[in-house]
Amino acid sequence: MSEIRSLHEVKGYVMNMKQEKSQVLEAIIIILVIATWLIGVIAYAYAPDIVPIHWNLEGKPDNYAPKDIGLFLLPLINTGLYLFLYFIPKIDPNNEQLKHSIKTLQLIRLGTHGLLGMIEIWTTLSIIEASTVKPEWIFSIISLFFAFLGRAMADVKQNYFVGIRTPWTLSNELVWDDTHRFTSPLWFYSGIGMAIVSALLSFMGFGAEIILTVFLIWIAIIVIIPIAYSFKRFREEKKSIQ
């Protein structure tokens, strides 16, 4: 009896630890969302009435809006995205599956809101200083974001909102799992590599147009390969059943 009680105590301790980690992650995510609003509020007093909201590949503003929109549109989007991603496990038809991927979903949300927070800082500084931005560096940041997603997505369970959602992954759970285990290192290592390549090209004096071209080719590759892989795995599974 004492051994059974000890086993239950260990399980309870592990569950409490997981819950505490989940709560800490959720708190960090909420702080990131609130931080984007605080950045806008602090910058409001220093920003002109009309501010840039879009920059061309040369880093120069090419579209403007009142500062209420320029400073608070991204925080508003960030908040809406937080609510949407938070409630995904509750509205997804496969919500029982997603309950086993809460940590993975939290990591994906953490990376997403972290990316939006960096963009908010980047654009707000440009608004306050009335300076051009360096669009070359955004490619490195987004590449690292994909690397982060790759690291997080390996264990995400089948669902309709997050992950590699193709007709073949959604119709076969094994194909879903294999596709994500395949895609995870692909995105992680190539994301780090693309971030380094973007930084090197910028350092060597190549313009944003060249870096954008390389970046888009990379995006196409890391999107097409998992789709093709999921189709290949689906056909293999179908043949094995026949």
Q: What annotation goes with each model-predicted range?
A:
Residues I42-A47, T79-D92, F148-R165, Y229-E236:
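Membrane-water interface of transmembrane alpha-helices
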Residues I29-L32, N63-T79, T132-L149, I217-W218:
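Alpha-helical transmembrane segments
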Residues K18, F234-Q242:
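Short, charged juxtamembrane terminal tails flanking transmembrane helices
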Residues Q19-L32:
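Alpha-helical transmembrane segments and their helix-start/interface "positive-inside/aromatic belt" motifs
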Residues Y86-K134:
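Ordered, amphipathic secondary-structure segments that act as subunit-interaction surfaces
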Residues P167-T183:
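Short membrane-interface loop/juxtamembrane segments of multi-pass integral membrane proteins
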Residues I39-F72, V162-S171:
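Active-site and channel-lining beta-strand-loop segments
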Residues I141, I210-P226:
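Small-residue-rich transmembrane alpha-helices that serve as helix-helix interface/gating elements
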